Amino acid sequence: FHYSVDYRIGTRYMGEYIADNFKREAMRVPLLRELLMTDSVYIASNITFDNLAPLSTYLGRPGDPAKGGLPFGEYMKRQDQHRQAEIAAMLDAKRFIDRASDLYGYANFVCDTSGSICEVVDPDNPDDPVLTCLAEQLLMVWIKGSDAHTAELVRRFDRAPKPMYYQPDFLHAMWQDYRSTHSVTDETCDPDHFVRWTYARALAHRQPRYGAMARWGVTVTAEEVARVTSPAVFDDLMVQAIDRKAATD
């Protein structure tokens, strides 16, 4: 059973926010406004495991409204909505483990977390509610990338920047630094350039947090995962990771 935390966020917890944002835009068009007001059309998100664009679009980017930017206050409000949704979605994992077993008879379960999980937990707190819940039900696995993988992620993001969730303190610092170093205001900031500029710094910010989270589980490398060709090979890799962890504890 594949439990996608991002999909759960975009459907169960932020689905109404996303749909309302679509409707807000549609209400600016006279024809669509009339149809909406008479319940003649239905507007909804078609988010899927493979297409999370409705969620990313709703999160948005701060900056110049003429370039699709949001006021920084509205941007931070949506960031906080995502934070609460992400925590709730991860705490739902236990219920979906039971559901997968009871409904479908699945003995195996994969919890596909969001990359921003490190932004909403405190790995140095032994009582962190989210990590405690996950550790009791799942084997947490960190797929550790190399510098080359990081560089490739940055290149991909530069080609197609997308909104993401970050810690409030980090975002405030980036927003202040960007405006001062680029001599722009909240209203003149280029939204895409800001998120591109922030992304590489965000990856560096996240690495030590992922490393600290790894103490709650095991670590495998991206190269090891790339060599997985079957369930049996995957199982063997997990055994190796557990053995490595036991040898260093």
Could you tell me what each predicted segment is?
Residues D112-T113, V130-S180:
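Conserved phosphate-donor/acceptor-positioning beta-strand/loop module used by diverse small-molecule
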